[in-house]
């Protein structure tokens, strides 16, 4: 049963009050570390700037734009790279422009690209830490959390934006998250709603195959996708023993294929991302037996060539067939729901989320099918937050942050088991009672730092 708009209002009202307590609690940072690291990052940025200026890319850039040259300008980079230097674009943006994101730049093969990417990375890390220093008061940050700024009715953060701390790049994550530390004698505890958007989507489309995956803890749709993508016949259990499967091929199946497909991408960019991004295979020309990352010591190209996949063109056609398998054979009910949902949106111009909120206006196909999932996925976390904040008033621990699909605690080490158990119980028992449209198990994953450690070094709570 879909909630009413009044139910949605009450959720945001209670959530705003709970987030106010999270803001008031504050999150501790290592101020001295931030200052030292900012100085180091600025020095490294100056060095990268000098190297970029002396490279082929930098010289062409300065020749075209002279005093107005800006390394941060995307349009300038497009002109230099794709017009002056004649590089063939690797991919385009949704607006049809030649892309200059990291993935596209790494395929360009131009002297100076590494220095530009390094400069970008250094700037991103520096900007995060400088924001920390700007907004800290007595060694604590008190970021604002908003519930009224995002179209999908998710939260946002500002002053500083704690939800913008890097996580995908290992160095960026380590440098920035190392600044977040617990109160003396405490630990940082992060509890994450695992795969929450996939679970919420399943509550809409009710595809039997997807429900089976989500209800069976031993099932692994990402490993199954990797088996299809890479012509692997062994059982998932045996494959996970092979070096490179879980760390590369399964992740390629998950983040390079399954999730992009669920969010509306199609086979061609997926093939490029899986092959060239995850597996480090060449974009141009035939692959050799020595190309790509190894699977159990054997280069992946050697394995693919045994299945008549000799280059990116062949692999792209193979991924097209895997895409057909995904939607026509594996998840046909999910596919039909996407078509029907978008058609209904086109007729009405709006739709109502499971949690009661209404979205309307001009939307792309991807927006119209993703928004009803993204909003309720966050609302499950928000309801969890309100319950936890209310129940730990007599605890020494405090919720100090809400990051995407997770809650961040400044926790007393002795209270960690109780906190994890509380969130697990809310997810597994209380939320399904509150919202009877939840028809799949909701799981959580918890990670914890050492006592007086940092957010950068976390271990899984068993």
How would you describe each model-predicted region?
Residues 36-71, 75, 319, 324-334, ...:
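Polymerase palm active-site segment centered on the conserved acidic dipeptide of motif C
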Residues 24, 142, 148-150, 231-402, ...:
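Conserved catalytic core of nucleic-acid polymerases
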Residues 1-172, 181-187, 194-197, 267, ...:
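Conserved "right-hand" nucleotidyltransferase catalytic core of DNA-directed polymerases
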Residues 197-232, 281-291, 356-358:
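Metal-dependent catalytic core segments for phosphate chemistry
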């Amino acid at each position: 049963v879909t909630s009413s708009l009044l139910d949605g209002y009450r959720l945001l009202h209670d959530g705003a009050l709970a987030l106010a307590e999270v803001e008031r609690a504050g999150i501790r940072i290592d101020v001295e570390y931030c200052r030292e690291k900012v100085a180091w990052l600025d020095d490294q940025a100056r060095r990268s700037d000098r190297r970029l200026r002396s490279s082929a890319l930098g010289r062409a850039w300065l020749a075209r734009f002279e005093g107005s040259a800006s390394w941060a300008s995307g349009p300038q980079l497009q002109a230099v790279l794709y017009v002056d230097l004649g590089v063939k674009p690797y991919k385009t943006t949704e607006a049809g422009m030649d892309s200059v994101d990291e993935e596209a730049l790494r395929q360009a093969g131009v002297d100076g690209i590494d220095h530009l990417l390094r400069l970008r990375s250094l700037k991103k890390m520096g900007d995060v830490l400088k924001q920390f220093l700007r907004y800290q008061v007595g060694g604590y940050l008190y970021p604002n959390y908003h519930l009224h700024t995002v179209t999908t009715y998710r939260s946002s953060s500002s002053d500083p934006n704690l939800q913008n701390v890097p996580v995908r790049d290992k160095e960026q994550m380590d440098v920035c998250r190392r600044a977040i530390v617990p109160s003396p004698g405490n630990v940082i505890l992060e509890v994450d709603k695992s795969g929450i958007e996939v679970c919420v989507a399943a509550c809409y489309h009710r595809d039997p195959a997807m429900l089976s995956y989500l209800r069976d803890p031993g099932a692994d749709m990402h490993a199954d996708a990797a088996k299809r993508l890479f012509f692997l016949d062994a059982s998932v259990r045996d494959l996970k023993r092979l070096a490179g499967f879980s760390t590369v091929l399964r992740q390629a199946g998950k983040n390079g294929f399954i999730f992009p497909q669920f969010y509306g991408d199609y086979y061609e960019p997926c093939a490029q991302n899986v092959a060239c991004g995850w597996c480090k295979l060449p974009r141009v020309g035939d692959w050799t037996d020595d190309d790509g990352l190894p699977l159990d010591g054997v280069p992946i190209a050697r394995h693919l060539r045994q299945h008549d996949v000799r280059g990116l063109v062949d692999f792209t056609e193979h991924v097209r067939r895997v895409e057909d398998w995904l939607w026509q054979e594996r998840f046909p009910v999910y596919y039909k729901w996407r078509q029907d949902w978008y058609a209904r949106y086109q007729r009405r111009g709006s739709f109502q989320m499971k949690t009661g909120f209404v979205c309307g206006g001009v939307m792309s196909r991807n927006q119209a099918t993703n928004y009803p999932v993204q909003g309720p996925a966050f609302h499950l976390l928000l309801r969890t937050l309100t319950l936890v904040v209310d129940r730990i008033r007599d605890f020494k621990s405090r919720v100090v942050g809400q990051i995407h699909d997770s809650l961040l605690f400044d926790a007393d080490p002795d209270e960690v088991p109780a906190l994890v158990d509380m969130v697990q119980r809310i997810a597994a028992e209380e939320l399904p009672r509150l919202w009877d449209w939840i028809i799949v198990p909701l799981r959580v994953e918890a990670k914890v730092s050492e006592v007086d450690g940092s957010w950068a070094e976390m271990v899984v709570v068993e």
